[in-house]
From Swiss-Prot:
Enzyme Commission number(s) of this protein: 3.6.5.-
Family: Belongs to the tubulin family.
Species name: Gossypium hirsutum
Modification sites for N6-acetyllysine: K40
Protein name as catalogued: Tubulin alpha-2 chain
Keyword field contains NAD: no
Residues forming the catalytic site: E254
Classification lineage: Eukaryota, Viridiplantae, Streptophyta, Embryophyta, Tracheophyta
C-alpha cells in the first residue's frame, strides 16, 4: 500500500482539514462514526481508500491524520463536531496558549514544547503503514502556528523521514484582505523553510477563493466554510487517484516528477472547474473541452496571480467522472493552440493528465452542484512570483523601520534570520525570472520583457 499521512497545523490547516475529511468520508461512504457499510472485508488493507484510512479490527475506519494547534478552541470544534467519533483522541493535539500571530512563538518558544509530541503521534501513524508514500501538510503562513510550528514540523520531518515526499497546501496572505499586521514577516520566514523542506507546495489565497465563490456560486458573503469546501474539492481531486482506482492514476511522487523542473521552483497554482451552483448546472452542458478551458481562466486560479503575466512550465490535469482519454487529448490540443496560454519553450509537452472514473461528490447542503465530470488543474507557472514579490514588498516597508521586530527577538529570534529569509526570497524571485527568460533567442523578441 502507498499510504499518505495528512498533517493539519493551525486554524487554517485544521478547518481545511475538516472540510477534506468530511468530503473523503462522503466519497467513500464512511459514516461519521467510522463505519463503512459497503466495505465487506473487515480489516482488509487492500482497498484503495486504505491509503488515507486505516482500519481497526472492529471495522472502524480512522483517518491517517494529525491535527495540531497551539491553542484548543479550533481543535475543540473537531472534538465536539459531527465527525468527533472518526478521529482517535490522540490524533488531536492542542496546546494551552497560542502563537499570537508570532512566527517565533510557533517556531521557538511554544512550538518546540509540543513538536516532540506531534512527531511521536506521526511516528505511530507511520508505523501503521506498510509503505508510507509521503505527507500532506496543511497550513497557512500568515499566522503564528501555521507558519512557525508548520516550518518546525517540516524541518523535523525532513530529518526523520528524509526521502518521503511532502506536499504542502499553503494558504498565503491575500493582496487586499489581511488577517494580521505581521503577516508579511510570518510569510517570509515561513516560506524560507517551505523552500527547503517541501517538495511541492500548492498556493491558496483566501481573496481569490472569495472571488470565485462570489462570481461563480453567487454567494454574496462567503464564509470560511464556503471557501474550505471549494478547497477540499481541489485537494480531493488531487488525491482521488490515490484513493480510487482509475484509468490514469497519479501518485504523490509523480506530481513532483512532472511539475518541478528545479527543486526551488515548486510553488503551484491550482484551479478547479466547473465551479457552478445547482441552479445554473441544470441548464448547462459541461463538456470536457469547456471545463478544461475554464480551468485555465485566470479568474479560476485559487491564488491571486495572473498566469497571462508568466509562462507555464508544467501542468497537471486531473479529471474525474465521465471522461475518456480521447476527449482529454482533444481538449489539451486546443489549449496548446491558444495564444494566451504560453509555455516556456524548453518544455514542449508540458501536460500530465490523470483520469479517475469516480464522479465528483458534493457535500449535502453545500454550494456546488452535482456534476458528471470535473477537472482540477495544478500548474507550475512563472507568474507565481507575483505572490512572493507582493509579500516581499510589504515585508520591506515594515522591516525598513524595524516595526514589530521586538516581538520576534523577545521570543529568541535573531534579526539576522529576517534578512536571511528575505534574501532567500529575493533569490527565489530571481530564479523565477530566469526560468521564464531561459529560452533560446525566441521568436518575436520575447526576451525584451526582462
Amino acid at each position: 500500500m502507498r499510504e499518505c499521512i495528512s498533517i493539519h497545523i493551525g486554524q487554517a490547516g485544521i478547518q481545511v482539514g475538516n472540510a477534506c475529511w468530511e468530503l473523503y468520508c462522503l466519497e467513500h461512504g464512511i459514516q461519521p462514526d467510522g463505519q463503512m457499510p459497503s466495505d465487506k472485508t473487515v480489516g482488509g488493507g487492500d482497498d484503495a481508500f486504505n491509503t488515507f484510512f486505516s482500519e481497526t479490527g472492529a471495522g472502524k475506519h480512522v483517518p491517517r491524520a494529525v491535527f495540531v494547534d497551539l491553542e484548543p478552541t479550533v481543535i475543540d470544534e473537531v472534538r465536539t463536531g459531527a465527525y468527533r467519533q472518526l478521529f482517535h483522541p490522540e490524533q488531536l493535539i492542542s496546546g494551552k496558549e497560542d502563537a499570537a500571530n508570532n512566527f517565533a512563538r510557533g517556531h521557538y518558544t511554544i512550538g518546540k514544547e509540543i513538536v516532540d509530541l506531534c512527531l511521536d503521534r506521526i511516528r505511530k501513524l507511520a508505523d501503521n503503514c506498510t509503505g508510507l508514500q509521503g505527507f500532506l501538510v496543511f497550513n497557512a503562513v500568515g499566522g503564528g502556528t501555521g507558519s512557525g510550528l508548520g516550518s518546525l514540523l517540516l524541518e523535523r520531518l525532513s530529518v526523520d523521514y528524509g526521502k518521503k515526499s511532502k506536499l504542502g497546501f499553503t494558504v498565503y496572505p491575500s493582496p487586499q484582505v489581511s488577517t494580521s499586521v505581521v503577516e508579511p514577516y510570518n510569510s517570509v520566514l515561513s516560506t524560507h523553510s517551505l523552500l527547503e523542506h517541501t517538495d511541492v507546495a500548492v498556493l491558496l489565497d483566501n481573496e481569490a477563493i472569495y472571488d470565485i465563490c462570489r462570481r461563480s456560486l453567487d454567494i454574496e458573503r462567503p464564509t470560511y466554510t464556503n471557501l474550505n469546501r471549494l478547497v477540499s474539492q481541489v485537494i480531493s481531486s488531487l488525491t482521488a487517484s490515490l484513493r480510487f482506482d482509475g484509468a490514469l492514476n497519479v501518485d504523490v511522487t509523480e506530481f513532483q516528477t512532472n511539475l518541478v523542473p528545479y527543486p526551488r521552483i515548486h510553488f503551484m497554482l491550482s484551479s478547479y472547474a466547473p465551479v457552478i451552483s445547482a441552479e445554473k448546472a441544470y441548464h448547462e452542458q459541461l463538456s470536457v473541452a469547456e471545463i478544461t478551458n475554464s480551468a485555465f481562466e485566470p479568474s479560476s486560479m485559487m491564488a491571486k496571480c495572473d498566469p497571462r503575466h508568466g509562462k507555464y512550465m508544467a501542468c497537471c490535469l486531473m479529471y474525474r467522472g465521465d471522461v475518456v482519454p480521447k476527449d482529454v487529448n482533444a481538449a489539451v490540443a486546443s489549449i496548446k493552440t491558444k495564444r494566451t496560454i504560453q509555455f516556456v519553450d524548453w518544455c514542449p509537452t508540458g501536460f500530465k493528465c490523470g483520469i479517475n472514473y469516480q464522479p465528483p461528490t458534493v457535500v449535502p447542503g453545500g454550494d456546488l452542484a452535482k456534476v458528471q465530470r470535473a477537472v482540477c488543474m495544478i500548474s507550475n507557472s512563472t507568474s507565481v512570483a507575483e505572490v512572493f514579490s507582493r509579500i516581499d514588498h510589504k515585508f520591506d516597508l515594515m522591516y525598513a523601520k524595524r516595526a514589530f521586530i521586538h516581538w520576534y527577538v523577545g521570543e529568541g529570534m535573531e534579526e539576522g534570520e529576517f534578512s536571511e529569509a528575505r534574501e532567500d526570497l529575493a533569490a527565489l524571485e530571481k530564479d523565477y525570472e530566469e526560468v521564464g527568460a531561459e529560452s533560446a533567442e525566441g521568436d518575436e523578441g520575447e526576451d525584451d520583457e526582462y
